[in-house]
């Protein structure tokens, strides 16, 4: 049984999604002013949302990418969480996720860095991947952290970016981070999984209405950041479910049972099992896509505690 706070959250986000979907257009249709409006509106939610007590923010630059550093008195300055925000690669920013990462930093006892990576449709792939790699290397080369002090992760499209950044770092032969924590990751941009259907779209209060509009117009959400002529579904640096996760660090996955992207996480879990990659997997009953965005729910607080416990196990013990 989900909490009363979660029940109220679902009601609120149904209204939010209805409002957003009434303005939403598919990647091939959307205009610059609509994109600008969505970005402003979503950023506003993170700015006005609650923050953990004593939250400190600082604007820094990692590998040439503007980044928001977030910490609280509980944050360990030697334990770093490089967190890529979600938003379908078309919206979202450190501002939109400020409330979320404030509580995440506080409860997981980490110092969180949120890159303001380039978005589509203005910036197409591989701009996002380049920024993901640059920010990780910036923590090492510019700030002096060791890879063992760094965890990476993110929600939705940010989870995708964490995965493809990991696979790119592996190809480059760079020392990998200590672990990954993925929140409702968009691991399958092709939308080919079992949960991509009308029933799940009706159950997913956050992105279901948007995806039904995309399907209706025979479009693909990934067109926000990849041009059709550049799509290669066998390229693991675009579509990470085609990748190999042997010799990768431990990976944690959290996903809601009521989200359209449920099969993304389920398939990723099977791949990690296939490749012998240490992992922890949690399905949150009754929860919607990136439920963590609502920090008023006890489910969110417990999810952040799960993340903190997972990261703790894989950071150096003396840091």
Regions picked out by a protein language model, each given a short descriptive name:
Residues 1-75, 227-232, 317-319:
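A glycine/proline-hinged amphipathic helix-loop "lid/cap" segment
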Residues 24, 58-319:
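Alpha/beta-hydrolase superfamily serine-hydrolase fold, recognizing
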């Amino acid at each position: 049984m989900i909490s009363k706070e979660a029940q109220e959250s679902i009601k609120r986000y149904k209204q939010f999604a209805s409002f957003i979907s009434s303005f939403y257009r598919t990647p091939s249709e959307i205009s610059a002013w609509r994109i600008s409006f969505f970005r402003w509106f979503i950023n506003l939610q993170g700015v006005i949302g609650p923050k953990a007590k004593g939250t400190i923010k600082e604007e820094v630059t990692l590998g040439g990418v503007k980044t928001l550093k977030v910490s609280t008195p509980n944050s360990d300055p030697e334990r770093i969480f490089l967190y890529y925000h979600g938003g379908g690669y078309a919206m979202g920013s450190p501002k939109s996720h400020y409330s979320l990462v404030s509580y995440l930093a506080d409860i997981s006892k980490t110092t969180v860095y949120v890159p303001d990576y380039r978005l589509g449709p203005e910036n197409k792939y591989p701009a996002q991947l380049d920024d993901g790699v640059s920010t990780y290397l910036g923590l090492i080369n510019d700030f002096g952290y060791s890879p063992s002090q760094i965890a990476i992760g993110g929600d939705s499209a940010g989870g995708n970016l964490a995965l493809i950044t990991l696979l790119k770092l592996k190809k480059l032969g760079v020392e990998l981070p200590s672990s990954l924590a993925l929140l409702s990751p968009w691991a399958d941009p092709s939308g080919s999984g079992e949960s991509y259907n009308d029933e799940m779209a009706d159950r997913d209060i956050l992105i279901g209405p948007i995806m039904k509009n995309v399907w209706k117009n025979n479009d693909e959400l990934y067109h926000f950041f990849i041009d059709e002529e550049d799509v290669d579904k066998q390229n693991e640096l675009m579509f990470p479910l085609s990748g190999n996760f042997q010799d990768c660090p431990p990976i944690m996955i959290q996903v809601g049972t009521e989200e359209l992207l449920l099969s993304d996480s389920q398939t990723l879990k099977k791949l990690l099992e296939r490749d012998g990659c240490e992992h922890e997997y949690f399905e949150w009953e009754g929860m919607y896509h990136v439920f963590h965005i609502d920090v008023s729910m006890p489910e969110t607080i417990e999810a952040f505690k799960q993340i903190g416990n997972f990261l703790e196990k894989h950071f150096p013990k003396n840091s």
